């Protein structure tokens, strides 16, 4: 890893034939600004962990990224603790199956627009937004979760979230919801009345430390497959 790298100019790079950019800047912990608007990502299949642990990265311009061939995106921004906002409006995620750790530990992220995200092929969303401590609202109304199997710790540690609408989530195939909303300390109410939990085996710590939650509708929860409820409302 190039942990001492503070600036880098890649404006002359021709990336038109590149198929993988996984871990490209992983551990570049001294980088503060990065402009990749000239990058051609039309053939790229993997962006996994691309900016992982770029802990001081405050400005990242990837607004021009077009990703029609993208298959792997897990952990792309994991550990980008200084990023405040991200523009992913041009991302094509229609072929991606694993969204795990995507924004994990993006502690300073205040704005995130994912309305254009296609998650129809997704099967995993483990730790997807874990420890996004500055996010206050998150619109996931466009998410297709019909194939998702694991949602464990998806919103774990999103301590500033005051509004979260996941009422449209299709959870019919989900088996693991452990820690899903753990430490969402600012949430006061949550509508999960449409959740299909018939296949869920693990709900441990699901609402653990949701200290502001005053209203929770779980009347339609099917707990017949559950084997672990430890710490569920702790």
Task: Cite the ranges covered by each PLM segment.
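Negatively charged
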Residues: 1-234
């Amino acid at each position: 890893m190039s942990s001492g790298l503070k600036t880098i100019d890649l404006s002359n790079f021709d990336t038109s034939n590149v198929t993988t950019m996984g871990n490209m800047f992983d551990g570049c912990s001294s980088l503060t600004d990065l402009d990749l608007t000239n990058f051609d990502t039309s053939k790229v299949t993997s962006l996994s962990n691309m900016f992982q642990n770029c802990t001081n990265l405050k400005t990242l311009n990837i607004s021009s990224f077009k990703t029609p061939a993208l298959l792997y995106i897990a952990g792309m921004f994991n550990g980008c603790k200084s990023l405040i906002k991200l523009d992913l409006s041009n991302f094509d995620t229609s072929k991606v199956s694993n969204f795990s750790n995507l924004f994990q530990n993006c502690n300073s992220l205040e704005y995130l627009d994912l309305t254009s995200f296609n998650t129809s092929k997704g099967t995993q969303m483990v730790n997807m937004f874990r420890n996004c401590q500055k996010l206050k609202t998150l619109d996931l109304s466009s998410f297709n979760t019909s194939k998702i199997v694991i949602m464990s710790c998806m919103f774990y540690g999103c301590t500033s979230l005051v509004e979260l609408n996941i009422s449209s989530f299709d959870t019919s195939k989900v088996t693991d919801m452990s820690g899903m909303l753990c430490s969402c300390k600012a949430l006061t109410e949550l509508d999960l009345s449409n959740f299909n939990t018939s296949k869920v085996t693990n709900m441990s710590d699901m609402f653990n430390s949701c200290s502001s939650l005053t209203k929770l509708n779980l009347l339609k929860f099917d707990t017949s497959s559950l084997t672990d409820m430890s710490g569920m409302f702790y």
